[in-house]
UniProtKB/Swiss-Prot annotation:
Transmembrane segments: 455-475
Tissue specificity as recorded in UniProt: Expressed in the endothelial cells of the stroma but not in the endothelial cells of normal colonic tissue.
UniProt topology in membrane: Single-pass type I membrane protein
Signal peptide, first to last residue: 1-30
Residues that bear Phosphoserine: S506
Protein name: Plexin domain-containing protein 2
Keywords: Glycoprotein, Membrane, Phosphoprotein, Signal, Transmembrane, Transmembrane helix
Role of this protein: May play a role in tumor angiogenesis.
Organism: Homo sapiens
Compartmental location: Membrane
Carbohydrate-modified residues: N103, N160
Domain PSI: 327-372
Length: 529
């Protein structure tokens, strides 16, 4: 084995480490962040090793759009494509108000963010106090103070929900609470949690470990989850004072940000060592396999939407209420999907049995299954009998177990009737016809297949019996050579069968006849020398 100098090995190791830390996270502009190491979060719980071997790139997806309420009222048609959506005319920094403007305003107008409608309540509005959840008055056994998050910096911990929380149309049962004033909602856990897929009432460089009064606690009553950052301080500017705020996730998908103590303007918080954000974000993950390195996958995270709230409106005794808007994911049938008028270009994919605009967390499945090509047709097959079958089989999909049975059956029906669209209603119709005896050809085929199967088994059994009988007879004759059966087979052994044998050893063909038993006379054929 070739030997390498220790100095070369050390240099190669340093280069690999530098390459790992600088190239592992690639941003939209193609340049690694200057403070990329300072923005990394540690997760307090262990996760599968497959996630540790994954490189995560964070790209801001370019097809983000903003919906205008006045435009939707004037035009009552669905958008044909994402490209027709009007882009945001100005960046978020241009929308910020001047520092000297009065923040004690009444109810703000509803702002449509395409997936959510946000409403900001000022300090003088009673809704700001009504939306604040007083955790101290809740049941003590349900309020949990996270010990690790309350005493560490840049840490995150998983929290299980007792209910299904819809986020951008996807149902979540698990979230990740971070010390930096935000909740991570992604399934792929990495160290760049601040990049995307977050619910951020106030994302900043908070460090609960600098004060004994700082805590991170949460409360789950079965219909809502409240996460509160209580008396937390900024690590790089402790003298600014403590912040107290919370985020409430409701079962119906609403998200409420409540602010009790905000000592300074949020726009004045430094983002040098940690990003400062207020809003929502979601993304989809694309998995790439690296051919040069087996068993290693590279995950690229594309942000497809972001809600950026006006940080200048975040003050003491203020609140933000975000109400979810309908999405394509809520439709489970082709007809309602393609005919929906919700502001998205919803399409139905028969292979996945899913309705989507093409931009959600299932983006990779949508593309790999060829759904973009199928969605161009914008048609549903066999949609007329949908209403007649839905009433008779409405309760079939009531439970998850029964729905799985229908899904399995739907695949079988699809293979038998390739011309029909395998929607949920079509599956129910096919099951109904089969129960009434309409599918006689299928029954005949099943009977024929059963007969062939039984005949094959009988033939194998007969063959086994014949072989076993032959073995037993052979063993018996070997041990009883004078028995009648042995003498019978000896007299009729192959060597005494009349036959013509081919004589070898000469260049001429020659035949010899085997004489019958009892005949002594014969002749000899001589060959020429």
């Amino acid at each position: 084995m070739a030997r390498f100098p220790k100095a070369d090995l050390a240099a190669a190791g340093v280069m690999l480490l530098c390459h790992f830390f600088t190239d592992q996270f690639q941003f939209a502009d193609g340049k690694p962040g200057d403070q990329i190491l300072d923005w990394q979060y540690g997760v307090t719980q262990a996760f599968p090793h497959t996630e540790e071997e994954v490189e995560v790139d964070s790209h801001a997806y370019s097809h983000r759009w903003k919906r205008n309420l006045d435009f939707l009222k004037a035009v009552d048609t669905n958008r044909a494509s994402v490209g027709q959506d009007s882009p945001e005319p100005r960046s978020f920094t241009d929308l910020l108000l001047d520092d000297g403007q009065d923040n004690n305003t009444q109810i703000e107008e509803d702002t449509d963010h395409n997936y959510y409608i946000s409403r900001i309540y000022g300090p003088s509005d009673s809704a700001s106090r009504d939306l604040w959840v007083n955790i101290d008055q809740m049941e003590k056994d349900k309020v949990k103070i996270h010990g690790i998050l309350s005493n560490t910096h840049r840490q995150a911990a998983r929290v299980n929900l007792s209910f299904d929380f819809p986020f951008y149309g996807h149902f979540l049962r698990e979230i990740t609470v971070a010390t930096g004033g935000f909740i991570y909602t992604g399934e792929v856990v990495h160290r760049m949690l601040t990049a995307t897929q977050y619910i951020a009432p106030l994302m900043a460089n908070f460090d609960p470990s600098v004060s004994r009064n700082s805590t991170v606690r949460y409360f789950d009553n079965g219909t809502a989850l409240v996460v509160q950052w209580d008396h937390v301080h900024l690590q790089d500017n402790y003298n600014l004072g403590s912040f107290t705020f919370q985020a409430t996730l409701l079962m119906d998908g609403r998200i409420i940000f409540g602010y009790k103590e905000i000592p300074v303007l949020v726009t004045q918080i430094s983002s040098t060592n940690h990003p400062v954000k207020v809003g929502l974000s979601d993304a989809f993950v694309v998995v790439h396999r690296i051919q040069q390195i087996p068993n290693v996958r590279r995950r690229t995270i594309y942000e497809y939407h972001r809600v950026e709230l006006q940080m200048s409106k975040i003050t003491n005794i203020s609140a933000v209420e975000m109400t979810p808007l309908p999405t394509c994911l809520q439709f489970n049938r082709c007809g309602p999907c393609v005919s929906s008028q919700i502001g998205f270009n919803c399409s139905w994919c028969s292979k996945l049995q899913r309705c989507s605009s093409g931009f959600d967390r299932h983006r990779q499945d949508w593309v790999d299954s060829g759904c973009p090509e199928e969605s161009k047709e914008k048609m549903c097959e066999n949609t007329e009998p949908v209403e007649t079958s839905s009433r008779t089989t409405t309760t079939v999909g009531a439970t998850t177990t029964q729905f799985r049975v229908l899904t399995t059956t739907r695949r079988a029906v699809t293979s038998q009737f390739p011309t029909s669209l395998p929607t949920e209603d079509d599956t129910k119709i096919a099951l109904h016809l089969k129960d009434n005896g309409a599918s006689t050809d299928d029954s005949a085929a099943e009977k024929k297949g059963g007969t062939l199967h039984a005949g094959l088994i009988i033939g194998i059994l007969i063959l086994v019996l014949i072989v076993a009988t032959a073995i037993l007879v052979t063993v018996y004759m070997y041990h009883h050579p004078t028995s009648a059966a042995s003498i019978f087979f000896i007299e009729r052994r192959p060597s005494r069968w009349p036959a013509m044998k081919f004589r070898r050893g000469s260049g001429h063909p020659a035949y010899a006849e085997v004489e019958p038993v009892g005949e002594k006379e014969g002749f000899i054929v001589s060959e020429q020398c």
